[in-house]
Amino acid sequence: MDVEAKCPMGGGKVEGRAVLFEMTNRLWWPNHLDLSVLHQNPPAGNPMGEGFNYAAEFESLDLAAVKQDIFALMTESQDWWPADYGHYGPLFIRMAWHAAGTYRIGDGRGGAGAGTQRFAPLNSWPDNANLDKARLLLWPIKEKYGRKLSWGDLLILAGNCALESMGFKTAGFAGGRVDIWEPENDIFWGPEREWLGDERYSSDRDLAHPLAAVQMGLIYVNPEGPNGKPDPMAAAHDIRETFGRMAMNDEETVALIAGGHTFGKCHGAAEPSQYVGAEPEGAGIERQGLGWDNSFGSGRGVHTITSGLEGAWTKNPIQWDNGYFENLFEYEWELTKSPAGAHQWTPKNPEAASTVPDAHDPHKRHAPMMATTDLAMRADPAYEKISRRFYDNPDQLAHAFAEAWYKLTHRDMGPYARLLGPEVPSEPRIWQDPVPASDHPLIDDADIAELKAQILAAGLSIARLVTTAWASASTFRGTDKRGGANGARIRLVPQKDWAVNEPTELATALAKLEAIQQDFNAGQTGGKQVSLADLIVLGGCAAVEQAAKKAGHDITVPFTPGRTDASPDQTDVESFAPLEPKIDGFRNYVGEKSVYSAEEMLVDRAHLLTLSAPEMTVLVGGLRVLGANYGGSKLGVFTERPETLTNDFFVNLLKTSTSMKWEASPDADVFEASDRATGEKKWAGTRVDLIFGSNSQLRALSEAYATADAQQTFVDAFVAAWTKVMNLDRFDLPR
């Protein structure tokens, strides 16, 4: 077949092989706004079907039986990939760590929550070399338990089982990670176009936000030191920044490094570039998803090549003990190189030369090794102080590592209410953003109607009520399930002081809502109460209803009580800081300049809110006419009847194409529309506003809401999207 002549998509050549390809819109127009991230992992791509309830399936699982199967598997060494020291535990710990360790607190992306280590690019990162073998070893477990046990849960459970099988007591395990079925395309892993590049740094080694890893394809830091330079103090700087961006403090960082490096070994039998083949995504079809084919010797066991470093940290690499710190502090270390040419450290002390068993040959012994990043635990004063305390107090290390490991492997799962299974700890941790349990009768329909009337009579505008509710609920991030209206943390530090929330106006609104709350609660005799969290959302719903009524629509915005109010003691201020919106297109707010366009940041915010492109579109149009802009700005308020729920934003934006001319103002991100005939200025808008008339896909959606018969459609769609955002964190409700 003549591919170029007969294929409607066109043809090309890759390494002499005919392939089909498509010149996508993205290739033709690289600056084209990408909305595809709002429609990832559609139901049609899920082989489990739309009615699949993973939580119910997992709860039916005999977790103890699963663990016994994993325990048995870990000590059954396979010839095709022999276990170091006869135990796959260290390999499974690395697999679980690297699955969870992609999490970053800046945008909540990454982590183990969707089983994405099995997809590109993660399955082919240099730092994940040979973890394809770990997942293949686990296939019999996955095959046996099927839909009851997701890959996301299995990877972390295997790590926990590995620790337990080697004598460590973990803090617990929770299931509930729902697998996705295609790679995540919303995650910016870095600007580099080659593995281990580090273009993510500006001057003074300032790491670009929201990245956490130091180089493309690494989970954390380069074990040889920054850019391969064996400088322990410089490595400490990278470690602190990287682990900090993954939500870990100094004590948690030391505990994780020491605890993880108590087990297993590094593999650097020979120079990788001479012997190691392509990663899984680049390997031949006959490799069946396996990569890093190694032609050195047997290619496995003693000949394994992974990181390039070679050796174990402790005398007993498959037993929990304090050997890591014993070796770190009792020996003096000097720089050397592994057989693969990687920088690492070896003891100066001759008595250390034969203290470590060989991973495969019982007749051989070795000296322990340390990476440059391990020596950072001794070189950096703060890390050294913590390390010596752990060395002197092994029980403190065990507790700190158990808690840090639990945090590492569960940080991206969101609130405690989402955790499943018999091994969930009895109490939530502060990093899970706990809220009090609801322990009182909830308000009923009559109470809701009365409270709505009181709120609307309290002297707060429709715009202020809408803005307050939006500010509270829209902190939610679908990535790590944090934020949202539950807890009413908008009244607490730091949220009450965020610039985007207009602190003075917010305080006034909250004071009036709190007065209504106090009066209502004081008047109850049967224990019934209403939380401020519920009142904030109810106020927004009442305002939307009032705005719709002004437009001639008698509607009821769905509202479900049951939110509670978190206390300052339940709120980690530092942990909440990354949730602050520095740019929010829904409120036409730009607090700081970004390397990304305002419209790109709008799409990013919409993705965090789990919105589709139609939902994003209808919310922007509705919020504009409701007056929910930051600071009461008129930018994008394309209506003569503000605080009225109309489709005027879309109607008037699309009319300007023929009757008006848009021009940039001195502020390049603000545009003004003037009458083509008279020159009279009519509207002003931002890039976020104009993108709905400029981008062909968003214009099509705008047209759908702008037609003469679309007003009811618009109102219904706005209410549905509004309700979705208000309830994003309501994991107590049926889904």
Swiss-Prot record:
It comes from the Bacteria. Its cofactor is heme b. Formation of the three residue Trp-Tyr-Met cross-link is important for the catalase, but not the peroxidase activity of the enzyme. The record marks R94 as: Transition state stabilizer. GO terms for cellular component: cytosol. GO terms for molecular function: catalase activity; heme binding; metal ion binding. Keywords: Heme, Hydrogen peroxide, Iron, Metal-binding, Oxidoreductase, Peroxidase. There is a cross-link at W97-Y220 (Tryptophyl-tyrosyl-methioninium (Trp-Tyr) (with M-246)). SUPFAM superfamilies: Heme-dependent peroxidases (SSF48113). The keyword Metal-binding applies. Pfam families: peroxidase. Residues 342-362 are annotated as: Disordered. It is an enzyme of class 1 (oxidoreductase). The keyword Coiled coil does not apply. GO terms for biological process: cellular response to hydrogen peroxide; hydrogen peroxide catabolic process. Heme b binds at H261. InterPro entries: Catalase_peroxidase, Haem_peroxidase, Haem_peroxidase_sf, Peroxidases_AS, Peroxidases_heam-ligand_BS. Its EC number is 1.11.1.21. Binds 1 heme b (iron(II)-protoporphyrin IX) group per dimer. There is a cross-link at Y220-M246 (Tryptophyl-tyrosyl-methioninium (Tyr-Met) (with W-97)). Belongs to the peroxidase family. Peroxidase/catalase subfamily. Bifunctional enzyme with both catalase and broad-spectrum peroxidase activity. HAMAP family: Catal_peroxid. Homodimer or homotetramer. NCBIfam families: cat_per_HPI, PRK15061.1. This is Catalase-peroxidase. It comes from Gloeobacter violaceus (strain ATCC 29082 / PCC 7421).
